[in-house]
Every structure is written in structure tokens, then in C-alpha cells.
């Protein structure tokens, strides 16, 4: 299901622990890492889609998390044409996402990457809050930065800024 501009409605999930570290998932049989995300089905609310994706990708149930907040508006990224399925070229541009910030209220052992028959991730770790911006595939970087900035400024008081984090990193990591 695409909107008029060719974007697929989607939710992104930033799951944090008590140290404000983020869940960082390794995609199955790939060397790429990302936040959990997934499409919104017709008739499904963003919040319902978020809980479905949280279970499908991370194996967590609503009782394992607390919603801290969400982005006010859709954040969009374009997918490079060589990443788009041939049959979608010309109509599909990318994803538009509502991002949720969740706090894990359960335990690390509640995470179950094999909760469904088609796992998205085959590994995971807790990661510094801002580190994913520099590690995610390039075409998603602006959306990751926008979501992390908006959610930290609105809901995580005292969080180090991305600019301060980036200034502390070795120059080869930016």
C-alpha cells in the first residue's frame, strides 16, 4: 500500500533500556544492522502496527515495554532505485515512518528473535543512543537522525546531543 507520492506507510521502533542504550538488530544473514521497523497494514493504526512489529521482530509483548513517545509527523526516506523491486520501479519511492520510543520494562531475556517463523534479526545488542546514525545504511541516516533528535529532545531530558557525540568520535567513524 503506497500513498500518492509513492511512500509505503511504516513504523520504526527505538527501544531503550534503563541506560538509554538502544536495541540494535542484525539483519538475518546480512552484515547490516538497523532498528526494528515494518509496514502498516490497511486499517491498522500506527500503534497497532508498532506492537505487531515489536513482537514479529523482537519477540516482545506490550507488557514488556512502555511507550515513551512518538514522532509528531511522518519521516520519509527514498530508497535507491537499484534497491527497489523491478515491478515497483516507477511507483515506489521509499518509506514514510512514524517512530516510537519505547522503554524496555521487561528483561533482556524477554527478547526473542525467533518468536515468529520468519525472523528479521539473527543477533542484537544494546548500543549507544546516537551510534546507529553513523552505522545504518546511508539512505536511512537522515531519518534515523531526525527520529533520534526529536524523541530525545522531547522525552529524554539531559541526553547528550548528537553533535557532542559525533565530536567525540574518531574522524573515521563519521
UniProtKB/Swiss-Prot annotation:
It comes from the Bacteria. A motif (Nudix box) lies at residues 38-59. Its EC number is 3.6.1.-. It holds the Pfam family NUDIX. GO terms for molecular function: pyrophosphatase activity. Its cofactor is a divalent metal cation. Keywords: Hydrolase. InterPro entries: Nudix_hydrolase, NUDIX_hydrolase-like_dom_sf, NUDIX_hydrolase_CS, NUDIX_hydrolase_dom, RppH. Residues 6-149 form the Nudix hydrolase domain. Accelerates the degradation of transcripts by removing pyrophosphate from the 5'-end of triphosphorylated RNA, leading to a more labile monophosphorylated state that can stimulate subsequent ribonuclease cleavage. NCBIfam families: PRK00714.1-2 (NF001935), PRK00714.1-4 (NF001937), PRK00714.1-5 (NF001938). Belongs to the Nudix hydrolase family. RppH subfamily. PANTHER family: ADP-RIBOSE PYROPHOSPHATASE, DIHYDRONEOPTERIN TRIPHOSPHATE DIPHOSPHATASE. This is RNA pyrophosphohydrolase. It comes from Neisseria meningitidis serogroup C (strain 053442).
Amino acid at each position: 500500500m503506497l500513498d500518492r507520492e509513492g511512500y509505503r506507510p511504516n513504523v520504526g521502533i527505538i527501544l531503550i533500556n534503563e541506560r538509554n542504550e538502544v536495541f540494535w538488530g542484525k539483519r538475518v544473514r546480512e552484515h547490516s544492522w538497523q532498528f526494528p521497523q515494518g509496514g502498516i497494514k490497511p486499517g491498522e493504526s500506527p500503534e497497532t502496527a508498532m506492537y505487531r512489529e515489536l513482537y514479529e521482530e523482537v519477540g516482545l509483548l506490550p507488557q514488556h515495554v512502555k511507550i515513551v513517545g512518538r514522532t509528531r509527523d511522518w519521516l520519509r526516506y527514498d530508497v535507491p532505485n537499484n534497491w527497489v523491486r523491478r515491478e515497483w520501479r516507477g511507483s515506489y519511492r521509499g518509506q514514510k515512518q512514524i517512530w516510537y520510543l519505547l522503554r524496555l520494562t521487561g528483561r533482556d531475556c524477554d527478547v526473542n528473535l525467533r518468536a515468529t517463523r520468519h525472523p528479521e534479526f539473527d543477533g542484537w545488542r544494546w548500543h549507544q543512543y546516537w551510534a546507529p546514525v553513523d552505522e545504518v545504511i546511508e539512505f536511512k541516516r537522515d531519518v534515523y537522525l531526525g527520529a533520534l533528535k526529536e524523541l530525545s529532545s522531547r522525552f529524554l531530558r539531559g541526553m547528550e546531543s548528537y553533535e557532542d557525540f559525533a565530536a567525540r568520535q574518531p574522524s573515521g567513524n563519521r
